[in-house]
Amino acid sequence: MARRPLLEFEKPLIELEQQIEQIRQLARDSEVDVSQQLLQLETLAARRREEIFQNLTPAQKIQVARHPHRPSTLDFIQMFCDDWVELHGDRRGSDDQALVGGLGRIGDRSVVLLGHQKGRDTKENVARNFGMATPGGYRKALRLMEHADRFGLPIFAFIDTPGAYAGLLAEEQGQGEAIAVNLREMFRLRVPIIATVIGEGGSGGALGIGVADRLLMFEHSVYTVASPEACASILWRDAAKAPEAAAALRITGKDLLSLGVVDEVLAEPSGGNNWAPLEAGATLREALERNLSELLALPPQELRDQRYRKFRAMGRFIDQASSDADSAS
């Protein structure tokens, strides 16, 4: 079995991974019983991996969120969705491959699913534009969401993008307008919307499909107004300060849950979703079904009212001096 690519902070695991692979090769090439040694090494590696991932910095979480083997939108759809039919095109001459969507069934309920889609290698990433959607992608997403609204189908959105594509052609085609229209129209939809940040959630590109009744987020995903690299370049004129920017931006699930931006943080397997994709898929499915059950109990107008109030409550300023004074009293 090929060894999974390890991130920079996982280097303490390299020697263990090499030993495990050598023992596996020995077991394949001979009749020697190495099950006990293999179990001991795998247990030790799992324990060390858990120790590492319990103390990740925001900058390290970004590396996990960008891992090339992290489950994508289509991966999750294939894990727990039956009768999946992808729908194409925005009916204006575009079929953006960076944002996919379609119809499917989860259990006995039909739903509309859509999300950003990255590639596994350079060729796929070029075809998918590295998960950066164009105006056509956001218009395709809106077409599918309007279809869901017309037929009373819940919407599941999966966010995984460094941001909307910022090329000249995208701007000429109305990138800002396409995202703005999505924001406006998503507030008007009468069906439940659940969005999940499965990897990166970058800027307006993420928000373009992120106006939801419930916003979920995986433990090692990130959700930010700008990438730390861009933030560091703007504030300090030095992209090398990205780790400091990542900490200041408060992009982790724990931070965003405390700020009221996300509603639930989903636990990941030890080592991140890329180590146990099926376990991650089961976690996501359970969370989607549970939250959907709660939202289906609400009438459409109440759904829209709660959605509006949820986003209006974001962005409140906290004066630290006043907060300290209140605590003292």
From Swiss-Prot:
Assigned keywords, A-Z: ATP-binding, Cytoplasm, Fatty acid biosynthesis, Fatty acid metabolism, Lipid biosynthesis, Lipid metabolism, Nucleotide-binding, Transferase
GO molecular function terms noted in the UniProt entry: acetyl-CoA carboxylase activity; ATP binding; carboxyl- or carbamoyltransferase activity
Gene3D superfamilies: 2-enoyl-CoA Hydratase, Chain A, domain 1
BP-aspect Gene Ontology terms: fatty acid biosynthetic process; malonyl-CoA biosynthetic process
Keyword Cytoplasm on entry: yes
CoA carboxyltransferase C-terminal domain mapped to chain residues: 40-294
Pathway recorded for this protein: Lipid metabolism; malonyl-CoA biosynthesis; malonyl-CoA from acetyl-CoA: step 1/1
Compartments in which it is found: Cytoplasm
Class of the enzyme per the UniProt entry, highest EC level: transferase
EC number: 2.1.3.15
InterPro entries according to UniProt: Acetyl_CoA_COase_a_su, ClpP/crotonase-like_dom_sf, COA_CT_C
Catalytic activity, as annotated: N(6)-carboxybiotinyl-L-lysyl-[protein] + acetyl-CoA = N(6)-biotinyl-L-lysyl-[protein] + malonyl-CoA
Major place of residence: cytoplasm
HAMAP family (alphabetical): AcetylCoA_CT_alpha
Complexes and interactors: Acetyl-CoA carboxylase is a heterohexamer composed of biotin carboxyl carrier protein (AccB), biotin carboxylase (AccC) and two subunits each of ACCase subunit alpha (AccA) and ACCase subunit beta (AccD).
Family: Belongs to the AccA family.
NCBIfam families tied to this protein: accA, AccA_sub, PRK05724.1
Identification of the protein by name: Acetyl-coenzyme A carboxylase carboxyl transferase subunit alpha
Organism in which the protein naturally occurs: Synechococcus sp. (strain CC9311)
Source species taxonomy: Bacteria, Bacillati, Cyanobacteriota, Cyanophyceae, Synechococcales
